[in-house]
């Protein structure tokens, strides 16, 4: 049993009912219903029943494998007479009592659909006489039986295959449920079984069941041998001819039931809350060998699993007709529904994959259309993803440059009163300024808004603080500087190559404008900076005899540092001292035309270095360094206080160092007393402390190792172990560390006592007989007269 969907907005007729029953029987809407409330759940063989439950068409292969061991002719043993009698009984239940709505839940997650009216004409037949099937949506049998209350009585109707068209056309409101009951034969005991099912015609496809849509290459008009399993179809097709029902009925297999589930009743109005909320669940049930009819209380699988492959609910794929072959493997043929009085046949076969791809392709086309409408980005200069600027940007760049030129001409008019031609050019520049402003407003009012705001900010700054060039310098120096700017700024900077900074946008960097100085401007005056274009070949009329000289005049070297120093608010006297005398003499010489560019660039670099050293920023930074000058004190008391602090700190430092030395000495003395110090004598003169430590570390952990070298080659060392036992081990076994080219080590305990002599001369043996008075001279007891007589007596001798 497979899940099928219908793509056309036609009425689901009762063809499916006829296909499920397997016979062309007339519809009898006024027969009594069957009551199954007396059935016991324990009578149901749950193992065989649940084993026959299959949820989708991908399980059809498993279903077919369950009956591979059955005889080939097991379905041919069906008694045709018993089948006809049972079908006659089943035709007695049509359009009886509706299902209680309180026992059925409302499914909010389902998609909406159209409402079928009686204006829809019955579908026309195919050329071979076979009418195409209509749309069908069927809920699951298990879901219906689980959700219905225990005391709810189900109504049963029988559907006829020949009267379905008229029955569909006679509906005056939305098509309601047509319950049906189908009989099946037990393959082993020929025991008749009947299953209660309700068929609810639905017009809207359920998005949850789209993954069960499959296609088949079989045409809508199938062979009689394939139509013998039509009782298992959900969206069934009519019989190819009226002479085939007996042969198909004779070849019928154990019935597979389809039970649609819906909360609606035939008396519901069109505005019912369940009108736009439907569900389609179909359960394939094999009832062979079951003992009862009562379904299980729990489904074998989760009924509302999310379908990761479901397509859009708005997509309506074609209705599929399931025709199982004799091997019971599900095969499906695609048939197209018709509406009105004309028949329309689908061209290519459509499946869930086809619908999904169609939807994704539509989304991708919309995405590509949005991509094509994306504006071009403004990127930076020398990258491979750069895009060329459009014409509007070029127009705005030219307008901004012309505004810069007009501002410079206006400033020249204010600073240079004696130049009449500059005044006239200023007037024309102002007129052109108004024209360009109007043109810029017409071209792009949104993009020129920022430029106009910058002009207003500059005007306010110049109004309150004055022009930056007039901040420090006097009027005369400003006139000279601006005159030099006007003479060679345009001509010189046009000769320079275009320097592209990676951090600058592409606005204006690739233009061939004459005034390159306007490319980089200060925030409020629009003048060129010193950092990027500081030197260039120039033509000056002040210091050179010829106007077209290529040599660097002094105005060239003085202009940029002046502008830089004006920003740093230095004094005007730095201007004269910052000029290079060598460049001045070169520029005044008649032979300056033949000066080489290499010498010129050397002078330029040398000049820049000197300018940097003479700049106020450089001098200020040197003067503020802590090592450039001595500290100054306000008074002598402050100096004395600082000196006392330094002396106190020095004394504290010396005291700490002496304490550390005493601590180390005490530790050494303690190690000597603990017998942890070993004296190692007669070591090689080239022995290092690391080597001696590595060789004696085999006996234990060493805290300290020292080596003392002598000029006579008698070198020695001291090794302090952490533990006394390690020192004893080194003293006893240290001789084993001697190499073949070395003498035996002298190993002793303690520190420096081995250098003391053990035998001393006793100089104090007669100390007891010593009289301090005997050491006194004889002259000490004589007076002056005695001493005089003694002296005279010595002279006579």
Swiss-Prot record:
Q: What mutagenesis or variant effect is reported for residue 538 to A?
A: Abolishes AMPK-mediated phosphorylation
Gene Ontology CC terms, in alphabetical order = chromatin; cytosol; nucleoplasm; nucleus; PML body
Consult the record and explain the modifications the protein receives after translation. Phosphorylation by AMPK in skeletal muscle increases activation of its own promoter. Phosphorylated by CLK2. Heavily acetylated by KAT2A/GCN5 under conditions of high nutrients, leading to inactivation of PPARGC1A. Deacetylated by SIRT1 in low nutrients/high NAD conditions, leading to its activation.
A GO molecular function term, named singly, is: ubiquitin protein ligase binding
Question: What keyword terms does UniProt attach to this protein?
Answer: Acetylation, Activator, Biological rhythms, Nucleus, Phosphoprotein, RNA-binding, Transcription, Transcription regulation, Ubl conjugation
Question: Which Gene3D superfamilies does the record associate with it?
Answer: 3.30.70.330
Top-level taxon of the source organism: Eukaryota
Q: Which residues carry this modification: Phosphothreonine?
A: 177
Q: What does this protein do?
A: Transcriptional coactivator for steroid receptors and nuclear receptors. Greatly increases the transcriptional activity of PPARG and thyroid hormone receptor on the uncoupling protein promoter. Can regulate key mitochondrial genes that contribute to the program of adaptive thermogenesis. Plays an essential role in metabolic reprogramming in response to dietary availability through coordination of the expression of a wide array of genes involved in glucose and fatty acid metabolism.
Q: What is this protein called?
A: Peroxisome proliferator-activated receptor gamma coactivator 1-alpha
What species was this sequence derived from? Answer: Mus musculus
């Amino acid at each position: 049993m497979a899940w099928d969907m219908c793509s056309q907005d036609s009425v689901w007729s009762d063809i499916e009912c006829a296909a499920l029953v397997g016979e062309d029987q007339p519809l009898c809407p006024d027969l009594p219903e069957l009551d199954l409330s007396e059935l016991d759940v324990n009578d149901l063989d749950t193992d065989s029943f649940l084993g026959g439950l299959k949820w989708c068409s991908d399980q059809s292969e498993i279903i077919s494998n369950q009956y591979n061991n059955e005889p080939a002719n097991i379905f041919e043993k069906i008694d045709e007479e018993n089948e006809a009698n049972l079908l006659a009984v089943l035709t007695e239940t049509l359009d009886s009592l509706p299902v209680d709505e309180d026992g059925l839940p409302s499914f909010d997650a389902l998609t909406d659909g159209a409402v079928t009216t009686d204006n829809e004409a019955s579908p026309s037949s195919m050329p071979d006489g076979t009418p195409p099937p209509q749309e069908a949506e069927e809920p699951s049998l298990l879901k219906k039986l689980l959700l219905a209350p225990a005391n709810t009585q189900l109504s049963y109707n029988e559907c006829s295959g020949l009267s379905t068209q008229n029955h569909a056309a006679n509906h005056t409101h939305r098509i309601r449920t047509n319950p049906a009951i189908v009989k099946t034969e037990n393959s082993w005991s020929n025991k008749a079984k009947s299953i209660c099912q309700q068929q609810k015609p639905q017009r809207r496809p359920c998005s949850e069941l789209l993954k069960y849509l499959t296609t088949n290459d079989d045409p809508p008009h199938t062979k009689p041998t394939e139509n013998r399993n039509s009782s298992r179809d959900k969206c069934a097709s009519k019989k190819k001819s009226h002479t085939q029902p007996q042969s198909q009925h004779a070849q019928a297999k154990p019935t597979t039931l389809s039970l649609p589930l819906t909360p609606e009743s035939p008396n519901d109005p069109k505005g019912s809350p369940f009108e736009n909320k439907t569900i389609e669940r179909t359960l394939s049930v094999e009832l062979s060998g079951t003992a009862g009819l009562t379904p299980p209380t729990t489904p074998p699988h989760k009924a509302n699993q999310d379908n990761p492959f479901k397509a859009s609910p708005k997509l309506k794929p074609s209705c599929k007709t399931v025709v199982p072959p004799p091997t019971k493997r599900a095969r499906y043929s695609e048939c197209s529904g018709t509406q009105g009085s004309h028949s329309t046949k689908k061209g290519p076969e459509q499946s869930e994959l086809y619908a999904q791809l169609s939807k994704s392709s539509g989304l991708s086309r919309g995405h590509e259309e949005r991509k094509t409408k994306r504006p071009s980005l403004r990127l930076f200069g020398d990258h491979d993803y750069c895009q060329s600027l459009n014409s509007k940007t070029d127009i705005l760049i030219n307008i901004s440059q012309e505004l810069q030129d007009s501002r410079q001409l206006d400033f020249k008019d204010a600073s240079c009163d004696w130049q009449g031609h500059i005044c006239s050019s200023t007037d024309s520049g102002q007129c052109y300024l108004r024209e360009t402003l109007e043109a810029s407003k017409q071209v792009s009012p949104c993009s020129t808004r920022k430029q106009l705001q910058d002009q207003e900010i500059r005007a306010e700054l110049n109004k309150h603080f004055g022009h930056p060039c007039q901040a420090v310098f006097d009027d005369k120096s400003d006139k000279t500087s601006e005159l030099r700017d006007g003479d060679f700024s345009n001509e010189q900077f046009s000769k320079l190559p275009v320097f592209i900074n990676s951090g600058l946008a592409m606005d204006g960097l690739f233009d061939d404008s004459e005034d390159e100085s306007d490319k980089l401007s200060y925030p409020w005056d629009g003048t060129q900076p010193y950092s990027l274009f500081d030197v260039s070949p120039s033509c000056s009329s002040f210091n050179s005899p010829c106007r077209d000289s290529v040599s660097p005049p002094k105005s060239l070297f003085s202009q940029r540092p002046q502008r830089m120093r004006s920003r740093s608010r230095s004094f005007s006297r730095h201007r004269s001292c910052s000029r290079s005398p060598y460049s001045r003499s070169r520029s005044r010489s008649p032979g300056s035309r033949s000066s080489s560019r290499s010498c010129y660039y050397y002078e330029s670099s040398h000049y820049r270095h000197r300018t940097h050293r003479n700049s106020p920023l450089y001098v200020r930074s040197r003067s503020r360094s802590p090592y450039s000058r001595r500290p100054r004190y306000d008074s002598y008391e402050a100096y004395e206080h600082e000196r006392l602090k330094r002396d106190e700190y020095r004394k504290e430092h010396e005291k700490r160092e002496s304490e550390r030395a005493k601590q180390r000495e005490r530790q050494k003395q303690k190690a000597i007393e603990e017998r942890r110090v070993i004296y190692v004598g007669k070591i090689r003169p080239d022995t290092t402390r690391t080597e001696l430590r590595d060789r004696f570390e085999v006996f234990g952990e060493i805290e300290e190792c020292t080596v003392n070298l002598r000029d006579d080659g008698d070198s020695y060392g001291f090794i302090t172990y952490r533990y006394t036992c390690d020192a004893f081990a080194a003293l006893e076994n240290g001789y084993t560390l001697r190499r073949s080219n070395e003498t035996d080590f002298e190993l002793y305990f303690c520190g420096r006592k081995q250098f003391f002599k053990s035998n001393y001369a006793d100089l104090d043996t007669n100390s007891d007989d010593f009289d301090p008075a005997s050491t006194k001279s004889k002259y000490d007891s004589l007076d002056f007269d005695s001493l005089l007589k003694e002296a005279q007596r010595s002279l006579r001798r």
